[in-house]
Every structure is written in structure tokens, then in C-alpha cells.
Regions:
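Active-site anion-handling motifs in enzyme catalytic cores
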Residues: 1-184
């Protein structure tokens, strides 16, 4: 997801300085050639938000409380820091909701009404925010992952060959991930 977001920004390490909040900063820096701070280092996160010109949150489904209300509050607190420090705050390709708790919906609405731009990746998220009473304009966009270019055909065919997948018929690839209470 982060790779897709960087590609959408046309990220060039020599032209831009991007700092990422990461669970594994060293790996993130090495893999994606960005600066990274640990999500568990509150001081570094606060410092980087303060030093930034723009705070971008997303993509993914960060603003929901089904996984944990604590997770949603963590991400809202980072967005809140950006608002407090008067930075431009942009929600990029977010999946938002569900939010089960009334107080969580109130906090989410309050924060969303103070960001500079909101883009969501599905109609349910847009509808949820509108029903919540978010007054900011909400833009509907594709999931950031859809902005990635496919691998060249010869590399794709080699991957299929190595995995003994026939190439003489039409194929579709689907990446499945467990989500909320679904069974896969």
C-alpha cells in the first residue's frame, strides 16, 4: 500500500523528503528509500509532523474501530497533530468505517471537518462520512494499489511458468485477505 501511495505521488528521493511512520523503520527505509520513524516513538512522530509541510494519511482502512478503537484513535491523533500544527492534512484513498461507538463517530466527524482534503476508495466510505455529518467535500477515487503498473508480460509469464500455471487460457489473479469477521 505504501509503495502504491509513493508511486501515486511520483516520489523521487532526490526531489522530495518523505517521512513514513512505520512498524519497522529500518526495513521501510531500505526497501522504499524514504525516511521513517517508529510508530511507537511518539516524540519522533510529533517532531516529524511538526516539521512537515503536508500530512498525508492513507491509504488503507485505518479509520475504523472493528479491528480496535485504539487503532482508530492512534491514526486520528496523528491527523489531529497535523491540524493542531496548522499543516495541510490530506486523507488519501482511505476506506473509512465502520465505527461502532457513538463517541468514536463524534471524534471522527470533528477531525474530518478540519482536514484540507478527503479522498476515499469506495462509495460506502463516502456515504458513511456524509451520513456522519462531515461537511468537507469528499472525493471518490480508486484504491491506491490500482495505480500500480503491471509487471512486463515476459516477467508475468515467467512467474506463471515457475508456478506451473497454464497460459493457454484467460486468467484472473485475486489477492484474498481476511477482513473483519469474514471467512475465507
Amino acid at each position: 500500500m505504501l509503495f502504491a501511495c509513493l508511486r501515486a505521488l511520483h516520489y523521487e528521493p532526490k526531489r522530495m523528503r518523505i517521512t513514513v511512520i512505520s512498524g519497522d523503520p529500518r526495513r521501510t527505509e531500505k526497501t522504499l528509500r524514504v525516511h521513517a520513524v517508529s510508530r511507537f516513538d511518539g516524540y519522533s512522530v510529533l517532531k516529524r509532523v511538526y516539521q512537515s509541510d503536508l500530512l498525508s494519511s492513507g491509504g488503507g482502512s485505518l479509520l475504523q474501530d472493528v479491528t480496535s478503537w485504539k487503532s482508530m484513535m492512534y491514526y486520528l491523533s496523528i491527523i489531529g497533530m497535523g491540524i493542531f500544527f496548522r499543516k495541510k492534512v490530506f486523507l488519501y484513498s482511505q476506506g473509512i468505517g465502520p465505527v461502532r461507538y457513538h463517541w468514536g463517530r463524534w471524534i471522527l466527524r470533528t477531525v474530518m471537518n478540519h482536514v484540507d482534503a478527503i479522498t476515499v476508495r469506495d462509495s460506502e466510505s463516502k456515504f458513511f462520512l456524509e451520513q456522519l455529518g462531515v461537511k468537507n467535500r469528499i472525493y471518490y477515487t480508486a484504491d491506491a494499489v490500482l495505480s500500480l503498473s503491471p509487471v512486463p508480460h515476459d516477467i508475468g509469464r515467467e512467474i506463471l511458468r515457475k508456478n506451473h500455471i497454464p497460459t493457454n487460457k484467460k486468467l484472473i489473479g485475486i489477492s484474498i485477505r481476511r477482513w473483519m469477521n469474514t471467512e475465507v
